Amino acid sequence: MLPMITGFMNYGQQTLRAARYIGQGFMITLSHTNRLPVTIQYPYEKLITSERFRGRIHFEFDKCIACEVCVRVCPIDLPVVDWKLETNIRKKRLLNYSIDFGICIFCGNCVEYCPTNCLSMTEEYEFSTYDRHELNYNQIALGRLPMSVMDDYTIRTIWNSPQTKNG
């Protein structure tokens, strides 16, 4: 008879412990009802990227001295720099500069080590295309600055949403 009573007591303790754990989980679930939603509706709402975000590379043709430091520090030797040596002034003249963003790993080494700061990272991250050859940007495409998320009137950022203004 005694083992049967201790078995029921053990069962009762386990039941109470399980009910306590379920109650704790339910309290955590209820605490999330007071929070704002984290999900954003992507094409219509966009998150503001951080200051150190590494997006598409912006290239300034006039500042480049064709030193090819960006090619040497790139882990995959990605930037293609075509130049011609001007014999009369003994300087390199940049002819073409291109980066294939289908291959780029966005490590930021080219921007970090560029001696003339002709390369910089932008906040653009939308590269979706149907043809991978469209991801090969030349110096003209790299020179265009993308529209900032904050300046785009068609996009509602998370900070401008009506939920954050009301609450």
UniProtKB/Swiss-Prot annotation:
This entry carries the following GO cellular component terms, namely:
chloroplast thylakoid membrane
Q: What domain of life?
A: Eukaryota
Sorted UniProt keywords: 4Fe-4S, Chloroplast, Iron, Iron-sulfur, Membrane, Metal-binding, NAD, NADP, Plastid, Plastoquinone, Quinone, Repeat, Thylakoid, Translocase
PROSITE patterns (alphabetical): 4FE4S_FER_1 (PS00198), 4FE4S_FER_2 (PS51379)
- Major localisation: plastid
What top-level class of enzyme does the UniProt entry assign? Answer: translocase
Q: State the EC number(s).
A: 7.1.1.-
InterPro entries, A to Z: 4Fe4S_Fe-S-bd, 4Fe4S_Fe_S_CS, NADH_quinone_OxRdtase_chainI, NDHI
Binding of [4Fe-4S] cluster 2: at which residues? C74, C104, C107, C110
Identify which cofactors the protein needs according to its UniProt entry: [4Fe-4S] cluster
User: What the protein does?
Assistant: NDH shuttles electrons from NAD(P)H:plastoquinone, via FMN and iron-sulfur (Fe-S) centers, to quinones in the photosynthetic chain and possibly in a chloroplast respiratory chain. The immediate electron acceptor for the enzyme in this species is believed to be plastoquinone. Couples the redox reaction to proton translocation, and thus conserves the redox energy in a proton gradient.
Q: Which family does it belong to?
A: Belongs to the complex I 23 kDa subunit family.
What PANTHER family does the record point to?
A: NAD(P)H-QUINONE OXIDOREDUCTASE SUBUNIT I, CHLOROPLASTIC
This one is known as NAD(P)H-quinone oxidoreductase subunit I, chloroplastic
Q: Where does this protein come from, organism-wise?
A: Draba nemorosa (Woodland whitlowgrass)
